[in-house]
Structure formats: C-alpha cells, structure tokens
C-alpha cells in the first residue's frame, strides 16, 4: 500500500490553531503537546488511512485520540483530507 498525502482543510487548520491558542492561555507546554499529538496522529493516517472508525457523517472516518479528548474527522480519496478537529464533547455538525 502506498502512502497517501495528507491534506488539511482551512477549517481544520483554523481549529487546530484555536485549540492551541485556547490551551496556551493556561499552559503553553500543554498546548504544544496537544497540537503535536494531533499532528502525529494525522501523520500516521498517511500510512494507515483506514485506521479511524467509520464516521457519523456519510463518507467520513473519525480518528479518535484516546489520550486526549479530540476526534479528527477525515475523508479518504486519493489523499487523506482532514476536515476539522473536534473536542470529544462538542456537538457535531450535520455536514463537514
């Protein structure tokens, strides 16, 4: 199986920045760890794109991070498209 290219949507990049900025207010080191953890998890999707569970929204998958409360919805096509980054307790949108 060949590695897929990871492609972040603008929405996903904005959410990652927002998450980092929010956590950084209280703990800059924790913010760096969370953002790095999300990045590492996403990078692994290049090699194992089907590792996430089937998504709640049609044609998506969800990478659940067990050690931090974030879920990464994504789509697999020629590339792995990162749709957004969601807190586990956040209300899900109808579409991504």
From Swiss-Prot:
Gene3D superfamilies: RelE-like. The keyword Magnesium does not apply. InterPro entries: RelE/ParE_toxin, RelE/ParE_toxin_dom_sf, TA_system_RelE-like_toxin. The keyword NAD does not apply. Pfam families: ParE_toxin. Transmembrane segments: none annotated. Keywords: Plasmid, Toxin-antitoxin system. It comes from the Bacteria. Toxic component of a type II toxin-antitoxin (TA) system. NCBIfam families: RelE_StbE (TIGR02385). Belongs to the RelE toxin family. This is Putative toxin Y4kP. It comes from Sinorhizobium fredii (strain NBRC 101917 / NGR234).
């Amino acid at each position: 199986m060949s590695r897929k290219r990871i492609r972040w949507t603008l929405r996903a990049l904005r959410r990652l920045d927002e998450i980092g900025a929010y956590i950084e207010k209280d703990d800059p080191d924790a913010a760096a760890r969370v953002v790095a953890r999300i990045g590492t998890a996403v990078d692994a999707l290049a090699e194992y794109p089907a590792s996430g569970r089937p998504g709640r929204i049609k044609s998506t998958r969800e990478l659940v991070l067990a050690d931090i409360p974030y879920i990464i919805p994504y789509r697999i096509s020629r590339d792995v498209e990162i749709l957004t980054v969601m807190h586990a307790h956040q209300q899900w949108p109808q579409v991504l």
